[in-house]
Curated annotation (Swiss-Prot):
Keywords: ATP-binding, Nucleotide-binding. InterPro entries: ARM-like, ARM-type_fold, Kinase-like_dom_sf, Prot_kinase_dom. Pfam families: Pkinase. The protein kinase domain is predicted to be catalytically inactive. Residues 639-662 are annotated as: Disordered. Residues 1-202 form the Protein kinase domain. ATP binds at L2, N3, P4, G5, A6, L7, G8, V9, N10, K25. GO terms for molecular function: ATP binding; protein kinase activity. This is Serine/threonine kinase-like domain-containing protein STKLD1. Belongs to the protein kinase superfamily. Ser/Thr protein kinase family. STKL subfamily.
Length: 662
């Protein structure tokens, strides 16, 4: 005879022919009606088939003449390896933590068995450590499933509770009032998990008092969870989520078994179990994810790691970080932290929403860190750059994603040293394709132009072919957005840098000149634009007489020379603008055919004034002297304005509406 259970006596018997041992549970019944009702409820259990359920082999009713009582006898397999209760008792004596791998293995089997029962709408009703038997060191089974009729025998329960108060401590609050459901099994399972997690620091009495306390005071659980965290009990992060929702006083607020399995097996420590592998295809419920993500940034990152394969968890985690107050983000983030987040997100590179949120987070983290400290070093590892480029390629039609990625790249490139790496990643060709696809989208165009401006400043060696194609698209963008000041400013800078690299084709020269002059006229007050436009014009005029002719020649009352004089009046106290202006004029004077036009346009007088104002700028004086020397040497009667022809072999500029007014 074994120790009696809550409802009856347990006998170990042996079959004479096979010498096979069985366990017979004898449950005393009130009367024949009570016995028959319990038997009727339990008969369907004979048909159950699950590897982690100790099934009933036979059920019968017998009369005991000695005590004049009727008994329901339940025959099941006998296992001599002990139960979970024996394991917990041994661990308590040693004050030892339950082996993590063993616990994961056993818990996966228990959960799988309970899920099987609950899918059939069968309630175990009697879950506790002593009813989880060990077949061997890595294999367990649930036993002693009960019926409503047996579990609602109040008089018997009261007697047993007085004999052994521990028996009822595993039961849910509503089960003590004889109301059972699948959610009462969840409570009992939560108590078992709690017992396994605390056996190293709570003795039997303390553990039982805790189980009783949480029925009436849910707050009793929090100090224990805190202690588990302090003692670094393995799996505490999962217990923090599971136990409050399994041990909720209101049954309807408790997790269902499938939710318990999802939370448990989707953490990284459970991925090796067969049940866990099956669970990878299921989604984590939103409310569970939200509870997981409560807390500080470190907690959120732990969740991202533990549920790295779950896209729905990653999306909510990233969005949580996006909305987190700045003082909680822990800025600036080191490169290692960014790489950790990106490594997780790379698993979900096909999911647009995740990529969009992640790139938005990068934009926020990098942008705010730079705003706090302009001298702060921006993370720009190969992993980060590769991720951003892969993201651009993965969803080339998403306006929002493309725009955000280029903004992030612009921040990273603001400190230089990545032009070569981005060139190797094919950035210039990709930028050309994106400009072509989104040339009507002002924000995307501006983001791309701003990035190119930053990159081309320190580019060393380049393959000219993609940049030559890129220059054509830049001119198209400027022509598409003729009144946009910011696009004009960024576009002028890019065209200047491309001209320095020799990446503007001769067939594009005239169009580029028109766009640069038009941009100056559109935005004369933007000093960056004016400087870069003058530099671009000077760079092109240095190599092309056609460019020089196009700048100088009158066209229906308009001339670039008049615009140059107007800009000087506006910036006569700015030596940088005046120096770039003189550099352009110096290159123009290298073409003899246009010298008369420059003379008649008042350039000589203008340069003389400039030379007198900027006596301390050696570079500027050098340009001025060069211009004056050429103009004075050629001060002779020349062609009249109406006789001036374009250089040999070149077509005259197209006639049309005047671009510039004197």
């Amino acid at each position: 005879m074994l120790n009696p259970g809550a409802l009856g006596v347990n006998l170990v018997v042996e079959e004479l022919e096979t010498e096979t041992k069985f366990l017979i549970k004898q449950v005393e019944c009130i009367d024949e009606h009570h016995a028959n009702k319990a038997l009727e409820e339990l008969m369907p259990l004979l048909k159950l088939q699950h590897p982690n359920l100790s099934l009933y082999h036979e059920m019968f009713i017998m009369w005991n003449n000695e005590i004049s009582s009727l008994f329901l006898c339940l025959v099941m397999d006998y296992y001599s390896q002990g139960t979970f209760q024996n394991i917990m008792e041994n661990k308590r004596k040693l004050k030892a933590v339950v082996d993590t791998e063993w616990m994961h293995t056993m818990l996966s089997q228990v959960l799988d068995a309970i899920e099987y029962l609950h899918k059939l709408n069968i309630v175990h009703r009697n879950l506790k450590p002593s009813n989880i038997v060990l077949v061997n060191s890595g294999y367990c089974k649930l036993q002693d499933m009960s019926s409503q009729a047996l579990m609602t025998h109040e008089a018997k329960w009261n007697v047993r509770a007085e004999e052994d108060p521990c028996q009822k401590s595993w039961m849910a609050p509503e089960a003590l009032k004889f109301s059972f459901s699948t959610k009462s099994d969840i409570w009992s399972l939560g108590c078992i998990i709690l017992d396994m997690a605390t056996c190293s620091f709570l003795n039997d009495t303390e553990a039982m008092q805790l189980r009783k306390a949480i029925r009436h005071h849910p707050g009793s659980l929090k100090p224990i969870l805190k202690t588990m965290e302090e003692k670094q009990i393995p799996g505490t992060d999962v217990y923090y989520l599971l136990l409050p929702f399994m041990l909720h006083i209101n049954p309807s607020d408790r997790l269902a078994i499938k939710d318990v399995m999802q939370v448990t097996f989707m953490s990284n420590s459970f991925k090796s179990s067969s049940v866990a592998l099956n669970m990878q295809r299921q989604k984590v419920p939103i409310f569970i994810t939200d509870v997981l993500l409560e807390g500080n940034m470190a907690n959120i990152l732990d969740v991202m790691q533990n549920f790295s394969s779950r896209p729905e968890v990653q999306l909510r985690a990233i969005n949580k970080l996006l909305t987190m107050p700045e003082d909680q983000l822990g800025l600036p983030w080191p490169t290692e932290l960014l790489e950790e987040v990106i490594s997780i997100i790379k698993q979900h590179g096909r999911i647009l929403d995740i990529l969009l949120s992640t790139c938005s987070l990068l934009l926020r983290v990098l942008g705010q860190a730079l705003a706090k400290d302009p001298e702060a070093e921006i993370p720009r590892s190969s992993l980060i750059i590769s991720f951003l480029m892969d993201t651009l390629r993965s969803h080339p039609n998403s306006e929002r994603l493309v725009n955000v990625v280029y903004n992030v790249l612009a921040i990273i490139s603001s400190q230089g040293q990545i032009s070569e790496e981005l060139e190797e990643e094919g950035l210039f060709q990709l930028a050309q394709e994106n400009l072509e696809h989104f040339q009507e989208d002002r924000d995307i165009c501006l983001s791309i132009l701003s990035l190119l401006w930053s990159l081309l400043v320190d580019v060393v060696t380049v393959d000219k072919e993609p940049l030559e194609q890129l220059s054509g698209m830049v001119t198209w963008v400027l022509a598409t957005h003729p009144e946009d000041v910011e696009i004009a400013e960024a576009g002028c800078a890019v065209l200047w840098l491309l001209s320095l690299l020799g990446c503007i084709k001769e067939s594009q020269f005239e169009q580029v000149v028109v766009l640069l002059l038009r941009s100056i006229q559109l935005c004369p007050g933007r000093v960056l634009l004016v400087n870069n436009a003058f530099r671009g014009l000077a760079s092109l005029a240095k190599v092309s007489e056609l460019v020089a002719f196009r700048i100088v020649v009158l066209e229906e009352g308009s001339s670039g020379l008049h615009l140059i004089q107007d800009i000087y009046k506006l910036y006569k106290d700015d030596p940088e603008v005046v120096e770039n202006l003189c550099m352009l004029l110096a290159h123009l004077t290298s073409y003899k055919e246009i010298l008369p036009e420059m003379e008649s346009g008042g350039i000589k007088d203008l340069v003389q004034v400039i030379r007198g104002r900027f006596t301390s700028s050696l570079e500027l004086i050098s340009y001025a002297d060069e211009i004056l020397q050429v103009l004075e040497a050629n001060a002779q009667p020349g062609l009249q304005e109406d006789q001036l022809e374009p250089p040999a072999g070149q077509e005259a500029p197209l006639q049309g509406e005047p671009l510039f007014r004197p």
